[in-house]
């Protein structure tokens, strides 16, 4: 029963991730090619574009998963890390660096201060006071994202246990907990602060905040680069998105197979 629940949680968590990812992938392809069938009149990715992206990601994920942990998954993960460092370095150097550094430290402090209250408070609005807006925000952001991440717990826990075999506890804590958290903070601070600075300074004039969420990153780079360089960086980001989605999906496939086979890594004995 526990294995079944873990499998369902992994499937649901991955589905949300891939759903968001293929939308951003479609927006990236549109930013590169300008093909009108990729987005509708409101700027949102079309159903056809998302289906094409989904087929592409799932096909690549299956091929990667079949190659095993030490081949396709490791190879794609190395590409993913290299491209991630390149994109983050770009925003650190060419983005709103000073504003981003301020945002980085303010965000850490606000997170530490707000986390206890946000972890224990559930707002219930009555339609007449500010708590109604807080309830709507909490449901759309805090509760939704926490539920999404919690659904990833069985998948990520088992995957980290598998790839961390032979590592010390110190190596695990630093490599799987501290460094990824810092990278996420740097990413949100520098990429987010660059977009916010463009809006506050009047350069964007609403182009970023009014864009579909899947296209906001590409709107940001369009504003800080020439058209040719923006297309080039869009290609890098699209490839990065694909490696993120494929490595997430193929790792999930690997863990689902392990759960379904009762923990056996040979995946020959079903456990359902």
Model regions and ranges:
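Membrane-embedded translocation segments of transport machinery
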Residues: 9-167, 174, 179-240
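Alpha-helical transmembrane segments
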Residues: 68-72, 161-170, 249-271
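Loop-to-transmembrane boundary segments
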Residues: 1-15, 268
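Membrane-embedded alpha-helices of multi-pass transport/permease systems
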Residues: 19-22, 26, 246-257
